[in-house]
């Protein structure tokens, strides 16, 4: 399942309080909620410069591949599920090419989300291509507590483009 949004972000982190102040003038209750979340997580609010919505994943995929080809510094990705197929194979081919050009390429995937679709051996193969790949939030059968799993699909390219 590919979420259909491309976000261009303004990453002036010092602007967090300024953004909350602007939001407060429009919606005081929402600004209070955002401030609480920002304070609790340590992540400041950032102002969205622009966003593009894709109604179908295929359109987003074509745009994402084009943007990956432009990467100069880094590509960071986080996925709940990794599974070999057209999407991942195409993205990995581009990432491997960029890694060979000196781009820092990293992928994290949820251990449980990918338990039946992606193995540690698959992750090691990415390492051979210059892509740093690690599972996170390992699934432990002996844990009986609730876990903090999400279904994120995030790709950041050179801190200026995010596909969510």
Please provide the spans of the model-predicted regions.
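N-terminal localization/anchoring segments of enzymes in phospholipid and broader phosphate metabolism
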Residues: 1-162
């Amino acid at each position: 399942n590919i979420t259909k949004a491309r976000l261009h972000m303004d990453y002036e982190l010092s602007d967090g309080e300024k953004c909350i102040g602007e939001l407060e003038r429009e919606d005081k209750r929402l600004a209070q909620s955002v401030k609480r979340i920002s304070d609790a997580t340590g992540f400041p609010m950032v102002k969205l410069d622009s966003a593009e919505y894709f109604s179908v994943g295929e359109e987003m995929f074509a745009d994402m591949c084009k943007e990956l080809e432009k990467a100069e510094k880094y590509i960071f990705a986080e996925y709940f599920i990794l599974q070999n197929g057209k999407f991942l194979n195409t993205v990995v081919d581009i990432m491997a090419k960029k890694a060979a050009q000196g781009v820092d390429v990293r992928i994290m995937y949820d251990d449980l989300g990918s338990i039946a679709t992606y193995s540690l051996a698959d992750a090691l193969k990415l390492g051979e291509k210059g892509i740093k790949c690690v599972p996170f939030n390992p699934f432990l059968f002996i844990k009986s507590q609730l876990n903090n799993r999400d279904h994120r699909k995030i790709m950041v390219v050179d801190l200026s483009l995010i596909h969510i």
